[in-house]
Curated annotation (Swiss-Prot):
InterPro entries: CsbD (IPR008462), UPF0337_stress_rsp (IPR050423), YjbJ (IPR026042), YjbJ_sf (IPR036629)
Family matches, as Gene3D superfamilies: YjbJ
Organism: Xanthomonas campestris pv. campestris (strain ATCC 33913 / DSM 3586 / NCPPB 528 / LMG 568 / P 25)
Protein name (record): UPF0337 protein XCC3924
Family per record: Belongs to the UPF0337 (CsbD) family.
Transmembrane segment boundaries: none
Family annotation (SUPFAM superfamilies): Hypothetical protein YjbJ (SSF69047)
Length: 69
């Protein structure tokens, strides 16, 4: 998975991610600190998604960022 966008711009993107995934806490984002795999795990935990769904959600978020450029 290409995690360059999320990893490289974590601070700037955190607000957008919090708006999209409101069940994640500030602490979740602090611990994740740019780690997309950890973020996927938290999405699974908070939303009850399987691994594929969480991965799809993160990829779709990354794609939306690329498309917005």
């Amino acid at each position: 998975m290409n995690t360059d966008i999320i990893s490289g711009k974590w601070t700037q993107l955190k607000g957008q991610m919090q708006a999209k995934w409101g069940d994640l806490t500030d602490d979740d984002f602090k611990v994740a600190e740019g780690n997309a795999e950890y973020l996927q795990g938290k999405l699974q935990e908070r939303y009850g998604w399987d691994r594929d769904r969480a991965q799809t959600e993160v990829r779709a978020f990354e794609k939306s960022l690329r498309d917005d450029r």
